[in-house]
A protein has these predicted regions:
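Short aromatic-centered micro-motifs
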Residues: 202
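Extracellular/periplasmic catalytic domains that process cell-envelope and extracellular macromolecules
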Residues: 13, 36-39, 113-115, 175-176, ...
Length: 211
């Protein structure tokens, strides 16, 4: 279920929802909510980069100078997002500025839910304009660490936990009988989550994807 408000999150959990998406962004979660989440054994998907995308283009974002981002992005899209009129509209958008405040609440709630033992899965709203597939998944993982999760738990949230949350038992972990979907990295992301960017090869069903 997609939501914004804490009261709605409590209601839908009581009603039997399987998953909460887009974060609680109006209030800090309380102990009752954390306990309810654990009691129901459901999944929380923060999607904080969705919030980022609603206001970050009010000026030029830092990642516009990231070589990892620039390697694949369409330059025409960057130029469009740099447009002064577009930036001004976003700066003057009440909803955009509201989502900016909501992001702070969402980040605090990730940390509280993680410390409380709630099952957290990585997810994004990528694919829409300004929400770059691949790069925003990386950003989401990095922000989850900033919010207080350990790098290893973010990796789990992005693989095995996420697969379990959508009842996909044949993916998410490397085990006999499962799909051999994996990436090979040049540095250890458990030491620094930014190392998820050091991709050397991608494998799907045991087959290396051509570069």
């Amino acid at each position: 279920v997609h939501l914004f408000y804490l009261d709605d999150a409590k209601y839908i959990l009581e009603a039997g929802a399987d998953m909460v998406a887009h974060s609680v962004r109006d209030l800090t979660v309380d102990e009752a909510f954390i306990n309810l989440f654990k009691e129901k054994d459901k999944c929380y998907v923060p999607t904080v980069t969705r919030e980022v995308s609603t206001f970050v283009y009010e000026s030029e974002p830092e990642f516009f100078s990231d070589p990892y981002f620039l390697k694949e992005v369409d330059p025409a899209v960057i130029e469009e997002l740099r447009g002064p009129e577009r930036q001004a509209r976003m700066r003057n958008s009440r909803s955009a500025q509201g989502y900016k405040k909501g992001l702070d609440v969402a980040m605090a709630n990730i940390g509280a839910l993680y410390k409380g033992g709630v099952k957290i899965a990585m997810g994004t709203d990528t694919g829409l304009p300004g929400r770059f597939q691949g790069y925003f998944e990386q950003m989401e993982m990095h922000m989850m660490v900033e919010a207080g999760m350990s790098p290893m738990d973010v990796i789990r949230a992005s693989t095995g936990v996420a697969a379990a949350c959508i009842n996909q038992g044949d993916i998410g972990t490397l085990e006999p009988g499962k799909w051999a979907d994996l990436i090979v990295l040049g540095a250890n992301p458990a030491e620094d989550i930014q190392n998820t960017k050091t991709i050397e090869s991608v494998w799907i069903a045991g087959n290396r994807v051509p570069e």
